[in-house]
Amino acid sequence: MNCLKQLIEIKKSSLVILNDNNYVISHMKPTNVKVLQVWHACGAVKKFGNQIKRQYPVRNYDYVLCNAEYWKEPYSQAFGVNTNQVLVTGMPRIDTLLNRNERDEFFLKYPELKDKKLCLYAPTFRGNIIDGFKIQSFDFTKVKDYVVLYKFHPLLGDIQCNGGVNMNKEDLYTLMQVSDCLISDYSSVIFDYSLLNKPMISYIPDVKEYKHNIGLNIDFDDFPGPVCTDEDQLVKALEFKDYDYDKLSYFQIKYMVYTDGKNTSRVIDTINQIMEEV
């Protein structure tokens, strides 16, 4: 019934804007309707969409937005489009990240965290709806110099972990702003966080298995921070000795071109151009 309702609304439209894949669009899109995929992430560390085995092929998109030229090829594969249909506009959400500041509000809510060194742990989810979701965690009590704030993917639910502070109900961008560093893995949050010019660590103990089973769209040699495969490496890496900010700048330029606060304007201009064509 939900598919039928969607189809009725789609048929009434000239343009459909998506931020996730859509079964109805991939199977029943009317020929006179244009589809713009803005996606819900700023990039894709792991392969996704048509790059991996899935229940149905992603198709019928007319345009896809991305953050840099680098993403044209992986996005064309994932969304079943030609590279010339992938448009480099930047994501509106980046304007939000760079232009707002909610530190004061956060520390009013959590006064016990003020003046503490805060490390945000924000991993991706593993698994799927059929087989169940999993999480790659570590012993937060081993981290001595930071308070670990953890926020997991919404699909994982409100999981509790000992030794850290549960931030699953807080806004991710607020947590990025208040934290001093990030630990993540195959999550696209590394692209957003890189623009804040703060240190990052990649904790990927299962990288060989992950490359084999899922596949990656980026080379972790590009990652600007320590890449750790066990907990001891991770704890040591949190000392952040000689962090390579030049490499961080290269990472930003390669994967996240626009930081001028005008991504939203470019996306609106793109939508207006599409509407003139329909």
Q: What are the language-model segments listed below?
A:
Residues 16-37, 168-213:
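A donor-sugar binding/catalytic signature common to diverse glycosyltransferases
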Residues 161-162, 188-256:
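Catalytic binding pocket for nucleotide-activated donors in carbohydrate/polymer assembly enzymes
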Residues 86, 92-161, 228, 259-265:
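Conserved catalytic-core segment of nucleotide-activated headgroup transferases in glycan assembly
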